[in-house]
Amino acid sequence: MVFDSLKNKVGGMFGSEEEEEEEKFLEGFEIKSASNDIIELPDVENIQDLDVTYPLIKPFANAHIFWDDEQEDVIYRIEEPELTEKEEEIFRRLKRAMEKKIDVSLKELNSTDKIVGYLGSRIKEISEELGMTIEKENMKKLMYFVYRNFAGLNELEPLMHDPYIEDIGCSGMEIPTYVVHSKFGSIKTNLI
């Protein structure tokens, strides 16, 4: 009781206000890998009828596998949120500053929650330093891309969460990445 009273008087020294602000800043943001989910994929008799979508990183990234009449081939498209021009500019500024601010190996942070918390605190710090106001919905998208690019494998990260992917291959620059899908075989992706 005495401790609580003292804690309330000195507040910030114990980090509670800071932690609360950080929680509000990241409120509603969560990275959920679908790699452990059981995803039933339909049997398709005619490959040209193939059109299936399933989550990879909820709620940000999905796999969309479909027959493309133009290319006359099956395509594996990673669907992610699109950044507006303004969000892209904010992301570029955050990314440049983050590259200078990250002062810990993300491998040392042994859970997704800790990594998200760490990256979120850096984003909050940077956005305040740069005088940027980031709306909550924009923040979720930006945080996803920061997580994907700093803790993950950039554009390849969603593929790492697909339980059906057996192999990923890229033969060079300006050539599409291919995946070996356990149900649909070798498929060209939209990643170049």
Task: Annotate the PLM regions.
Residues 35, 51-65, 69-86, 95-192:
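N-terminal "pre-motor" subdomain/linker immediately upstream of P-loop NTPase catalytic cores
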